[in-house]
Amino acid sequence: MNMAPTLATACASLPPEGALAPRGGPSALMTHGTALIMAGGTGGHIFPGLALAHALRERGWRVHWLGGAGTASQPSMESQLVPPQGFAFESIDFSGVRGKGLGTLVRLPWRLLRACWQSVALLRRVQPDVVLGLGGYITLPAGLMSVLLGKALILHEQNSVAGMANKVLARFATRVFTAFPDVLPNGHWVGNPLRAAFLQVPDPATRFAGRAGPLKLLVLGGSLGARALNDIVPRALALLPPQARPIVTHQSGARQIDALRANYAGAGVQAELTPFIDDTAQAMAGADLVLCRAGASTVTEIAAVGAAALFVPFPSAVDDHQTSNARFLVDQGAGWLKPQSELSPEWLADMLQKTERIELMGRGLEAKKLQKLDATHKIVAACEEVVR
């Protein structure tokens, strides 16, 4: 497995699914519109946005990206990931308010007014034909100002519980798309935009044919890692007899790789440990079981691959949206859900020892039934409709 050294490798398998071909041969590469994509804060907003950005550019669009700049010591994720992909990166001075204290709330009206003023200047300079919002605090002021200036606003909500910005903007939007059903009153359920690699994986029955020996466990902590998983998984494995342990690949995030190595060494357990995984689609496909959080992109990718997953939602996620995301699959028999407060080394060791490969294949098949693969195509088509 090729392990990547930086966050940017998570974009390696772009362009996205559908890889919409330019229309009408060489002449179709002529620019026929300008899109401003608004997304930032987390990979759950950024990676679907990048999938759409590549698809639009392949169709001849100019693409600008609006995100947060972050700080000199801690730049935003989007400011690191987007420019290397060749898209013009713009930023305004605005940040989230949840959990920031009373002082931040008191200053919110002034900060929002300033961000709206900056957004107007940006929109007049870029002159987008379509403004495409994918959630995150940064989308609120620019989305409101795009409506005020008469721009077409298209939204995509990645989670099963809509964020504040999309809840506000949805009532003014030209079109609204969602990754899960019944999220917004006027939303069209299309799934999440996916990178191409997730569409090139054999189905679960083909992958599991002929598999034997120890189970293969893939632990995904995400770009920032999941400390609870990093602590509990090595201890759970240590409770199993060596011959009953699965073959483990554990991805921790760069900040926690040293602590993870110490945890496994202390438990006396062997595993493949890495801060990042270059090809997540192939890693999921090669595993019998995936142990992970339940961010929107992860849940969508699990369904696209048809992988059996044990979801441990991040307990501090806004509106507990990760639990809701996971239930979309789990309620259909496509995985397991275990709250972090209930996850213990003893429970996990027992689960790993009792679970058979045939059951894991079945869970993967159920997940595959819930895949939605044409989100990029439908959203790009909507962008093109509004400029005709």
Curated annotation (Swiss-Prot):
Keywords: Cell cycle, Cell division, Cell inner membrane, Cell membrane, Cell shape, Cell wall biogenesis/degradation, Glycosyltransferase, Membrane, Peptidoglycan synthesis, Transferase. It is found in: Cell inner membrane. It holds the Pfam family Glyco_tran_28_C. GO terms for molecular function: UDP-N-acetyl-D-glucosamine:N-acetylmuramoyl-L-alanyl-D-glutamyl-meso-2,6-diaminopimelyl-D-alanyl-D-alanine-diphosphoundecaprenol 4-beta-N-acetylglucosaminlytransferase activity; undecaprenyldiphospho-muramoylpentapeptide beta-N-acetylglucosaminyltransferase activity. Its EC number is 2.4.1.227. Pathway: Cell wall biogenesis; peptidoglycan biosynthesis. One of its GO terms (biological process) is carbohydrate metabolic process. GO terms for cellular component: plasma membrane. SUPFAM superfamilies: UDP-Glycosyltransferase/glycogen phosphorylase. It is a peripheral membrane protein. UDP-N-acetyl-alpha-D-glucosamine binds at residues 42-44, 159, 195, 223, 277, 322. It catalyses: di-trans,octa-cis-undecaprenyl diphospho-N-acetyl-alpha-D-muramoyl-L-alanyl-D-glutamyl-meso-2,6-diaminopimeloyl-D-alanyl-D-alanine + UDP-N-acetyl-alpha-D-glucosamine = di-trans,octa-cis-undecaprenyl diphospho-[N-acetyl-alpha-D-glucosaminyl-(1->4)]-N-acetyl-alpha-D-muramoyl-L-alanyl-D-glutamyl-meso-2,6-diaminopimeloyl-D-alanyl-D-alanine + UDP + H(+). InterPro entries: GlcNAc_MurG, Glyco_trans_28_C, GlycoTrans_28_N. Gene3D superfamilies: Glycogen Phosphorylase B. HAMAP family: MurG (MF_00033). Belongs to the glycosyltransferase 28 family. MurG subfamily. Cell wall formation. Catalyzes the transfer of a GlcNAc subunit on undecaprenyl-pyrophosphoryl-MurNAc-pentapeptide (lipid intermediate I) to form undecaprenyl-pyrophosphoryl-MurNAc-(pentapeptide)GlcNAc (lipid intermediate II). This is UDP-N-acetylglucosamine--N-acetylmuramyl-(pentapeptide) pyrophosphoryl-undecaprenol N-acetylglucosamine transferase. It comes from Albidiferax ferrireducens (strain ATCC BAA-621 / DSM 15236 / T118). The lineage of its organism: Bacteria, Pseudomonadati, Pseudomonadota, Betaproteobacteria, Burkholderiales.
